[in-house]
């Protein structure tokens, strides 16, 4: 079973988080993003967004890819498909914070550049990302892209795209998750709410940070009927079952619980 969920426990801890394997020590420090694959390997982006590491399940460094190799510019997300190919959300930044272009870059299982599978030009002066999520498939990647009033979900494996109508998506949405089996879209808004898309035009509110003091939900991922979000305010993981019986029954996990249970590792 292909693991399709990003390791959001790393994302929320960001620059302060470190991990050491007790048998073959390897330390991650200043991490900005990480994800796992079906073999138990971890892909890590450092806080400069210019270096990516692949670490084996037993803590060995398998390879390192750097922006200086001309494979990418500034990596903000990373996932691996079922074939072992690696996909990066790559961003070109100009004048400090302004985004000139975004893309999806494909690397081989050895970390070598293969191609750019998607490219999105940014509006002049924009500081917000248009690509707001990635989900690996068996032979490719699904990525979510904001448009004015919709989220475009594109599947590189199938060469297909589908638009989900979401009012003011460009200004409201921070990030997305997608479940291919149920064709379900989830998203986090800048004001700290998590929604599930519905065809009715009234999307279902799954979580509202206004009801939890200090909560700031960020990156989300979906796996086996459960939605996870890194809470950078409370420094834990929001866990939201999304099956028919338990939708809305939110609970929370510590980073240690998440690692132990392998739910989002």
Where are these regions (language model features)?
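Flexible "stalk/tail and boundary" regions
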Residues: 5-265
